[in-house]
């Protein structure tokens, strides 16, 4: 399994309100560039758009501590989506055959390993940035 080495580090801050300020600032810079829905272009998917609004909806379903952990990895996740050429781990959803889940693995400049999950609709080809989280090491 190949890992993408991001040039970004964790976002600064120890509380949710501090971290969300930096994450929203980065999100708003992406949003201002696009006309309709915010997206980033991915090198792995040959320049296809990966929409990032679903991430925020998914994030608000988590508790405050988990939100803070995930938001700290936000800038590294965006860097991975834009620049990674490493092949992801692809998971086929048994309940919905039209959905593929791609898991990209990366490492921040601080050395923290993380996982980015992208959902792809096979019918339309639409790709959505779903989630970012710490990679749990299981032995």
Locate the predicted segments by residue.
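Ribonuclease/tRNase effector modules and their secretory precursors
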Residues: 1-139
């Amino acid at each position: 399994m190949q890992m993408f080495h991001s040039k970004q580090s964790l976002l600064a801050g120890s509380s949710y309100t501090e971290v969300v300020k930096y994450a929203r600032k980065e999100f708003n810079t992406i949003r201002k560039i696009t006309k309709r829905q915010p997206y980033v272009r991915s090198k792995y998917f040959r320049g296809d758009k990966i929409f990032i609004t679903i991430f925020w909806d998914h994030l608000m379903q988590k508790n405050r501590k988990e939100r803070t952990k995930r938001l700290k990895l936000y800038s590294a996740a965006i860097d991975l989506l834009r620049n990674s050429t490493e092949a992801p781990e692809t998971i086929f959803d048994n309940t919905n055959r039209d959905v593929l889940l791609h898991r990209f693995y990366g490492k921040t400049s601080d050395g923290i390993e993380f996982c980015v999950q992208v959902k792809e609709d096979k019918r339309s080809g639409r790709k959505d940035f779903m989630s970012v989280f710490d990679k749990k090491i299981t032995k």
